[in-house]
Amino acid sequence: MPQEEEIMAIKVSENGRLFTLQTKDSSYQMFADDKNVLLHLYYGEKIGEENLSGLIFCTDMGFAGNPEEAGPNRKYSLDALPQEIPGSGVGDFRDDMIEIRHADGSFAADFRFDSFEILDHSYAIPGMPALYDTEEEKGETLVITMTEKASDIVLKLFYGVFEKENVITRAARLENHGETAIELEKMLSFSMDLMYENYEMIYFSGRHAMERTAERIPVQHAKVEIGSTRGTSSHHYNPAVILCEEGAGETHGSCIGACLVYSGNFVAAAQKDQKNQTRFQMGIHPTNFCFHLEKGETFDTPQAILSYSGTGLTKLSQQYHEIIREHICRGAYKHAKRPILINNWEATYFNFNEEKILKIAEQAQKLGIEMLVLDDGWFGKREDDNSGLGDWFVNEKKMNGSMAQLAEKIHKMGMKFGLWFEPEMISEDSDLYRAHPDWAFAIPGRVPNHSRNQLVLDMTREDVREYLLERLTTIVHDAKIDYVKWDMNRSVCDVYSHVAAQSRNGELYHRYVLGVYDLMERFLAACPNLLLEGCSGGGGRYDAGMMYYSPQIWCSDNTDAINRLSIQYGSSFFYPISTVGSHVSVCPNHQTGRVTPFRTRGDVALAGSFGYEMDLNKISEEEKEMVKEQVAAMHEYYELTHEGLYYRLTGLKKQDFMAWEFVAKDQSRALLTIVKTDAEGNMLPVHTKVCGLAEDKLYRCSLDQEVRLGRTWNRAGLTLHQVLGEYESIRVEFTEVK
């Protein structure tokens, strides 16, 4: 490898020891010092390639040990240096990135710089999703090889650069070249030490039916940590966080985002150290994790997507929307127009037959809806949620025939047809469980936990995945199914495989996720024209890993339009609006009992993939006309909402309305939506900012036909001259005047 080498976005200098990764608007710099410690120097606004190691201030901190190479220099300590790969047990007492237990029982991981390689394409991760190259943009990759000081263990650090999107990715691979086995007890996707700023962390917490509530707290010396040990990314915390400077807002301030491309246990943490440096980390959660690596075996972390914005949260979100939409989402529906669907779940729950389903479909077709989705209850002896999971055979008595017959009737109406599955689960009251009780996770000698009265299938087993693949593909092919909703309705515990060696039990949570990814990959390969929508009790697995397989995910089981404002607001910080499964449902709402105007429910659902969750035969004629108008609006604004730039116009502070805006990429039009969330006496007017219009173009506002320059709208905003009652909404369009 030459000492001086560069590809456009990756700059290497100083005899191959200084690495500067350049995107359109940001820079990331590392330096391998004379002791071969890889130091993190900078991540922020775009700079040149000058060596910034002079930013590091070394002093004797006291009780901070010194590596032997430092000699008498007490100022040089791993406990105080800003590192890229902090290891355990060798003098850095902050949270480490990697922990290894060696054959002699010791814990030590001291990795030093060895070499580097540059690739003119993005990197892949075996068995896991990752950003991929397209014809429009290829990533570039820097691979830094680190060797452990006292053992034959190699660590490869992967840095991917997507220049146009201002994205840098991180991942790592551990290779055991030694003669003895090791136990890998922790290995994160990245660690980064940020030297001098004060940060706040924005993270997204919640619970089932109330996911991704945005919260913001300062990063202090007490660690800020979120994560999941539920076997999924979970409803409770999302694997995406933001570090921003104090006071940063939508249009100002420095922001660093981190989004994990993974659907299992994870951790994300930030903490100030004794020098007020902030250590920022993300990866697989170390709880219940232990990977046994024999000689020649390797372990790969999931990918973390990093992005920087120097101009606030809006730009950061738009960068994530673009990278996920273009380099994570795949398949036939990556850009193809998604059908407007109706799902029967809230209309019927388990109480349906062919006649009921056809009546719902007939009315939906008359109103312009394009696909019917048959939810839970069509298979096995599934009359409630206590039985039948795993028996993926059509209940022909309930359905009055085969699924192919029902699908043909739906297709003859000119509609597409979709089905619900929950492949990863099994009911004890099922033929599958009676035949294969060992296929379920259960610890010998213990009664397993039940959730929704179901158990979790051992997705690490090839025979389990083969059975599921055969059942799913057979049904999809036989009935010419157009869409599948893939659900997962419980957390994972009692993890024990009846075929894995006991020494490998610490690998099962991760191997479970790999098994799910493997099944999804093979299923989509067998059904390449299928639209797959992810779901886990709504938004319990709403993450970039799942979006690699399902370009839209049911955002929440909560369909209440007012609650959805918060859920969809939090989702928008990282995930494209095109990934948000959002439906109009009945009122009073089944989750909250709230009554919300039909128009408002439609306006909120338009900020997503859009559909209905009701029996349209039971709504009024006036509401049916509203359905027609909403369907027409979805077609009218589809490209704008699914491909345009998204702006949050209201923020984390409490207000009596919520507003958001879509702007076409060519800035020719914009759609602004306002929902009144609270009513008061002597009502004050609603005034909102407008964003993203071209400064020197003229735009006509649909409210009053007023024409103003884009810069005027952007700065002066918009005042409603009509009073919105509680929960009422309005759509406002801005159109370029040519």
Cite the ranges covered by each PLM segment.
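Polysaccharide-binding surfaces and accessory modules of carbohydrate-active proteins
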Residues: 12, 17-28, 37-271, 287, ...
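Conserved, mostly hydrophobic/aromatic
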Residues: 25, 172, 296, 342, ...
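Glycine-rich, aromatic-flanked loop segments that form ligand/cofactor-binding clefts
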Residues: 77-122, 250-264, 307-332, 369-376, ...
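Short Pro-Gly-centered flexible turn/kink motifs
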Residues: 107-113, 291-310, 727-735
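Carbohydrate-binding surface patches
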Residues: 250, 651-694
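Aromatic-lined carbohydrate-binding/catalytic grooves of carbohydrate-active enzymes
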Residues: 333-470, 483
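Active-site neighborhood of glycoside hydrolase catalytic domains
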Residues: 400-402, 436, 440-597, 609, ...
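C-terminal beta-sandwich/jelly-roll accessory domains of carbohydrate-active enzymes
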Residues: 678-738
